[in-house]
Amino acid sequence: GHTAKNRLLVFSQKPAPIQVTWLGYPNTTGLSAIDYRFTDFIADPIGKADELHSEKLLRLPNSFLCYKGNETIVANVNLQKKDKQHITFGSFNNLLKVTPEVIKTWSKILHAVPESHLLLKDFRLEDNARHYKTLFRSEGITEDRIECHGRLPNMTDHLKLYNKIDIGLDPFPYNGTTTTCEALWMGVPVISLLGNNHAGRVGASILNSIGLNNFIAEDINNYIELAIKMANNENLLVKIRQNLRKRMQTSSLCDGANFAKDIEKAYQDMWYKHTNNYQLNKLDNKSYPEIKSINCFSTAYKDTKMDGPR
């Protein structure tokens, strides 16, 4: 896609009979030479963005993502509040996604949860921490409640920093992807606002794939409400955190074998259509799956070797 160091000029010359775009760039390439784009039914519901793509959207039956977490790094399932006497929200997303509306929304959450803190991590904070603290101060949040981290030496330190967060907050309208998977893997539930396009629905896709649909907010007020409810229900929050890695490990999001089969089946369908002028079969004919609701706020809820700077 249209990201740094892309090779779209090469692909525009159609070096292969079938070309597919996937991951990294959450939109169309605009190139007629690219035939397909991998996605799923949550990130791109049928009929919502099809006409806006030069590619044919090929929706994988589960998630368009597959994640493999680092098994050697232990997730801290205890709450930071136990040690620090306050709930800590957090986001490790690119701060370009943290818009004025996001800052205003997160500030409302901090106001509603007394003494709560917000931990932010992005390489830009090495030089701009004071600027972002000032933005929150303009919303009435004192600087001591905003903790900023810049780049860390390696992936291990990066992942361990999630252990300082109790609840993750997904930015909008541009959600996190890798950061959401990392947070969930490290036992941090993430609240995400359901948007109108792929970039704003990735969080919902990830949460849906691991069965945490009640962390998907329908609107900003619901987003704030979910964050407050979760912060005020410490027993439930601990239960969810204790079970979160296992939930991920047994979900379609981390099922590499079946994900590979879905991709291989898609390739077969593409080639069959290419050689036989045949319409794609079941992968494109499935109905849009409804996001099922799980009442995680009820007492019945029970489930719940990369290196370098990060």
Regions found by a protein language model. Give the residues of each.
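Generic beta-strand/beta-sheet core signal
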Residues: 22, 39-40, 92, 121, ...
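Conserved catalytic-core segment of nucleotide-activated headgroup transferases in glycan assembly
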Residues: 62-153, 157, 161-163, 280, ...
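Active-site-proximal region of nucleotide-activated glycan assembly enzymes
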Residues: 13-79
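Generic, well-ordered alpha-helical scaffold segments in large soluble proteins
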Residues: 105-112, 135-139, 161-164, 168-171, ...
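Catalytic binding pocket for nucleotide-activated donors in carbohydrate/polymer assembly enzymes
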Residues: 143, 171-256
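C-terminal amphipathic helix plus adjacent low-complexity
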Residues: 93-95, 108, 124, 129-134, ...
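A donor-sugar binding/catalytic signature common to diverse glycosyltransferases
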Residues: 1-16, 20-31, 154-202
